[in-house]
Amino acid sequence: MIKQRTLKRIVQATGVGLHTGKKVTLTLRPASANTGVIYRRTDLNPPVDFPADAKSVRDTMLCTCLVNEHDVRISTVEHLNAALAGLGIDNIVIEVDAPEIPIMDGSAAPFVYLLLDAGIEELNCAKKFVRIKETVRVEDGDKWAEFKPFNGFSLDFTIDFNHPAIDASTQRYAMNFSADAFMRQISRARTFGFMRDIEYLQSRGLCLGGSFDCAIVVDDYRVLNEDGLRFEDEFVRHKMLDAIGDLFMCGHNIIGAFTAFKSGHALNNKLLQAVLAKQEAWEYVTFEDEAELPLAFKAPSTVLA
């Protein structure tokens, strides 16, 4: 049986909040089978839980938030959520003593290292996947995203920002997902932002944690970071990282082929909600026999060592 995964032990890290610029302590806790992914704000009394749920997602200019029925939110969840998807973590409680997850270096890599440091434990309960049975597509002007049936998890993403620095890079990235591929090819790709946007936001007391340490920063012509890019096509790789995190907001790894053109957090979420709302378009599946599991979700040696 392919089993659900959680952490072996509690781990903790500190970082800076993108919005406040203040220190945030992040604690990742193991959770029992069928708990799901739960984000928790411990700065509130009593603490408030935000279960990962496609319907709770709000996209802001700066980040992705989860919002509850009382309009309380937890911000900047997308990169940690991508790391959870990448390593196939089904059950976890994520605590922060702030309104936001720390931005770290703007990628998912610090979260991957933290999860691997905690160790991954299999629980004696079948892991549920969402399998796509029918094509579902959403559009917004010239932007679109779709899922098609596929026995694995593939992603094909194209960006078009009409910006000299971004146009000079390769703007399409496609891959067959696996934990190894995610860690090597996607997890280190950083978020990017425009200097003028960051300066404007900071002048209004927002994005106070925004810096060259946690993003690729571009002006109207070029990348401003002294160290340059981690990958020639880091921009599109990061958009794929975002999509992996967005699509894991249903709390389950997805078996299907994802293709997107100029999509972002909001459209990715719209696609996920469109899939889940169409009962005949998907089904839950479990695997008794590892031989039947799509290669995409085979546990890498580095994870279950």
Curated annotation (Swiss-Prot):
GO terms for cellular component: membrane. NCBIfam families: lpxC. GO terms for molecular function: metal ion binding; UDP-3-O-acyl-N-acetylglucosamine deacetylase activity. It comes from Enterobacter sp. (strain 638). Pathway: Glycolipid biosynthesis; lipid IV(A) biosynthesis; lipid IV(A) from (3R)-3-hydroxytetradecanoyl-[acyl-carrier-protein] and UDP-N-acetyl-alpha-D-glucosamine: step 2/6. Its EC number is 3.5.1.108. This is UDP-3-O-acyl-N-acetylglucosamine deacetylase. It comes from the Bacteria. InterPro entries: Ribosomal_Su5_D2-typ_SF, UDP-acyl_GlcNac_deAcase, UDP-acyl_GlcNac_deAcase_C, UDP-acyl_N-AcGlcN_deAcase_N. Keywords: Hydrolase, Lipid A biosynthesis, Lipid biosynthesis, Lipid metabolism, Metal-binding, Zinc. The gene is lpxC. The active site is at 265 (proton donor). Disulfide bonds: none annotated. Belongs to the LpxC family. Its cofactor is Zn(2+). It is an enzyme of class 3 (hydrolase). Catalyzes the hydrolysis of UDP-3-O-myristoyl-N-acetylglucosamine to form UDP-3-O-myristoylglucosamine and acetate, the committed step in lipid A biosynthesis. One of its GO terms (biological process) is lipid A biosynthetic process.
